[in-house]
Structure formats: structure tokens, C-alpha cells
């Protein structure tokens, strides 16, 4: 294992590779973190594996040994634990840099229970304070999180559509999108889908 101190790694902009769909990823990050089989994905793409976290039940003994040898830091998690491997990876990153910006790849698709656990990461009270710093990305979707209260969303030129999913039964307002939602026309849905950006203007929710 090419071990270094976790404090020596630049955690400012981190990519986390989970063990799901491998169809999409980017490399414009300061460091790469593998979660279980996602660690092998990083090595196969010839990227530097800063941190490998997991119980590694989805890899062979030989693959686990390779991950341990190549990772700068290796964390073997117990199979029985309160937090998922992905949650443990995120908590490690935010422990080292509370301002880190994290993009997660390979978190969608596959087992529905795993995917839903990933989508609702900020429901973990230990991760909730960092929700604005977490994004989940695949080739078609970008999931970001907003805390309760007033928030601004900056449009991205590579996405045309957006949707909103309030976690609680709150009265959501949407200002600046094609289909606005205000007190005057409010109706409750669990998912407000198929909205659109307008001229890359800020959206207020």
C-alpha cells in the first residue's frame, strides 16, 4: 500500500466512485476515492486511488489485495455497521476537509435499495450539514441537495430540465423556472418533474 497521511491529500474537490453503473465519470478532481468495488474501477481507469473504503465483499481476494496495495490509504470496514460504505467514505472526506466538494459516480442503477440509500444520503444526520457540498452524477442525471429555507440554484449549460423532490410535506416555491410554483397556484406533489431552465437565470426555491 502506497500509504500517506490523510491530511496530506488535497480534499478540496473529490470524486467518489461507488460500485454501480460505470458508464459515466469525469477526471477533473483533486483526488479519487473508491467505495468497495469502485476502488477497482479507479485503478482500472489508471487514476490515483487516494482512499479505498469498504468491506470489499463485492471483489475477490486477489482484487482486494490489489486495491490494498495500490491505495494511498485503505479502510477495511466491518460488514455489520450502521453506516454504508459510501457514507463512511463521505464522512472521512468531510472530517479531513469540512469544505470539500464531492461528486459521486456509480451511485445510481443496480439494486434499488442501494440506489435509494444513495439518493437519500443527506437523511443521515451526520451528512446533513454537508448536503450542499454533495452531488450524484451519471450520464443523464445530476442530483444536488438543498437544506430547508431559501436557496438559489445556478443553471448548468449541460442540463435542460430539472425536477424537485421535497423530503418533507413543505410548501415549495419555485421562482425563475419555466413552470413557477407560488402561494397563488400551489399544489402538493412528492415530485415536481419536467421543469425547465430559462436563459440560464438563477432559480429561487
What are these regions (language model features)?
Residues 173-200:
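A conserved acidic, glycine/proline-rich C-terminal tail/linker
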